[in-house]
Amino acid sequence: MFSPDMLQETISKIEARLKNAGTLKDDQKTELLQLLSTLKGEITTLSDTHGERAQSIAGFTEVSTHEATRAEKHPELLKLSVQGLASSVEGFEKSHPSLVALVNRIATTLSNMGI
């Protein structure tokens, strides 16, 4: 069941993980935190009409961030989590194009970090 508080909690966890990630360069942290800030607004808006989908997007963002920032990388898990993240916005291309573009940018950024 969707809860706006759960959504905000998930975003806060991602933000904390990024801020404390020792595996990220400062410019990567800055970029991802800016993208996350924008994502927070986008999925908050989406949650008004599609609460569970908004939570899924936040959840896949959290898992993808975890995989991209962990000290011991597991490329296959990162790939799967990023694919899930990209899939989480399918169907919103017309109604929420900026959300789709943003999530795709986050997915690409996280994927590139796992190289």
Model-derived regions: residue spans:
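Strongly charged, low-complexity linkers/loops
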Residues: S64, A68-A86
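A structural signal for well-ordered alpha-helices, especially hydrophobic packing surfaces
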Residues: E15-L18, G22, L39-S47, T61-A68, ...
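Amphipathic alpha-helical binding modules
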Residues: K79-I115
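Short terminal alpha-helical segments
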Residues: M1-L33
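Short, charged early-sequence alpha-helical segments and their helix-coil boundaries
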Residues: T45-V63, P75-L78
